[in-house]
Design a protein with these regions (language model features):
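Catalytic cores of nucleotide-sugar-dependent glycosyltransferases that transfer UDP/GDP/TDP-activated
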Residues: 1-336
Length: 336
């Protein structure tokens, strides 16, 4: 089976620090290659893969301001689709622009919808349902107006996240610094529980960062560390009493949630979006509806078995399970 894996070009694949879509694309690509699938990864030219790397984009546009996102996204797409007939299947991880090319080629295409942002994007999904096989990353993120080939939860390489059986007394926030992700709520919950909070993530909303994070960050009770990747990411996720994920939107998935649990860290999350699909209340974390409930949950974290947190990820959110699910979908589409 020859698969063209179309990665986004906002960040390198795999990302150096931040880049959840690129991370999932890389994890799936490498797992498929390990299973003997002939995968060509179409990504930025600084990307890395055990498969075949192909591309025309010199660098990620979020890292290099000289790269015009719109120009190079379409150049990226054109480069792949010009050679579509070389492949049995195209797997699009790069959002809806690729759909404009789908009707122009005979090669079947899978699109992983990494988050259905609003009804405004439906015009780039509904007309292509007979040509593109859509995959949701959670049942919560399925849109009622679309047909889906499957729901496939993300998976991670659990061995990349060392188990910490103890953690610490401190709390953790891990995500974009943006109102959606609830940094302000995490700060409020940490203060109310009188525990230190460590925040990690890229600043996506500068005004919000200046209003909510900067005044609170005294490097004693609240510390902002910026974005981290690799071993530093795993170390941060494991060395906490709990991850506070008090989101203000219906998040389609949450990689940091399952990464934290893989390290043994329980997650206290808002009971919305995909969180009830990831968190089993009282087993690997707690689902809450307010900051007050989060504060109460912080005091109950001792009831959670950190080994059970890791086991829940091993059973449900491994990269092997994700790769097997996608491979089964590919075979079903191709009639193999």
């Amino acid at each position: 089976m020859k698969v063209a894996m179309l990665a986004p070009i906002s960040w390198r694949t795999p990302p150096r620090h931040y880049g959840p879509w690129e991370l999932v694309t890389s994890l799936l690509t490498e797992a498929l290659v390990a299973r003997g699938v002939d995968v060509t990864l179409f990504a930025t030219l600084d990307s890395e893969t055990a498969g075949t790397l192909d591309g025309v984009v010199p660098a990620p546009y979020s890292e290099n301001p000289s790269i015009d996102a719109k120009v190079w996204e379409y150049r990226h797409l054109a480069h792949l689709f010009a050679q579509a007939d070389r492949f049995d299947l195209i797997h699009n991880q790069a959002d809806f622009p690729a759909h404009a090319f789908a009707a122009l080629v005979a090669t079947p295409m899978v699109t992983t919808i990494h988050g259905f942002s609003s009804d405004r994007i439906l015009p780039m999904y509904q007309p292509f349902q007979d040509r593109v096989h859509y995959v949701a990353i959670s049942d919560a993120d399925r849109h009622p107006s679309l047909r889906y080939a499957a729901t496939i939860h993300h998976g991670i390489s659990i061995e990349d996240f060392s188990f910490d059986p103890v953690g610490s007394d401190d709390l953790l926030f891990f995500g974009r610094i943006h109102p959606d992700k609830g940094a302000a709520e995490a700060i409020a919950a940490a203060r109310a529980s009188r525990r230190a909070l460590h925040l990690y993530g890229v600043v996506q909303d500068g005004g919000y960062y200046e209003r909510e994070v900067v005044p609170a960050a005294d490097a004693v009770t609240v510390t902002y560390h910026g974005a981290v990747g690799g071993a530093a990411r795993a170390a941060a996720l494991g060395s906490a009493r709990a991850l506070l994920h008090l989101i203000n939107f219906d998040e389609p998935f949450g990689l940091s949630v399952i990464e934290a649990m893989a390290c043994g860290t329980p997650v206290i999350a808002s009971a919305r979006g995909s969180m009830p699909e990831l968190i089993e209340d009282g087993v690997n974390g707690f689902l809450v509806d307010s900051v007050a409930e989060a504060v109460a949950a912080i005091e109950r974290v001792g009831e959670i078995d950190r080994a059970a947190c890791r086991q829940s990820v091993a059973e449900r959110f491994s990269v092997d399970r994700m790769a097997d699910d996608y491979l089964a979908l590919y075979r079903r589409i191709l009639g193999a």
